[in-house]
Amino acid sequence: MAITTRQYFQLIQDTAASVTRSHANWTSFLRTVARLYPYRFPDQLAIHAQRPDATACTSYDKWNEQHHRYVKRGSKGIALLDDSQATPRLRYVFDVSDTASPQQLPAPQPWTVQESQHADLGQALEASYFIPVGYGLVPQLEALAVQAALDYWSNFRYDILGIVDGSMLEEYDEAEVGALFTQALSASVA
């Protein structure tokens, strides 16, 4: 049974509250969105709520026309909000596990970085972000995540401090909130 727009908004609200309730929930959400990076945050919440195991999602038409795959009969679509019109409505996407290929083509795979690409990627990151390659790609990416979190805190500190009231962080001073925020954000990004 398809959900209504009202049910969709409730689902997003409930999911946002759930993923921020515990470290395990947040980690589970991050595992889902790591595979679904092209989608906006509300869409990522919706996909996680309806199919946390989803790996590659797109519309029925794109599966047919661009990927030469068909959506299997009986597959349940994942509802996402289409707010491109004056009245928001729901649109549906399907995970690759809901598809098959009439020509027996392999399913599209998410991109990965091969070991042989680490050196080139590390050099490109060093040239762009001035973070030395050092001990390898993983520490470099972790350092980049910390740098990005510190930059974000610097740019949006007052906005973030403005929403701390009523949360468990209201007891902390600005420096402590900043440290907790940058630590959590850099861990989430890395």
Tell me what each language-model feature is:
Residues 1-190:
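N-terminal accessory/interface modules of nucleic-acid-binding and processing proteins
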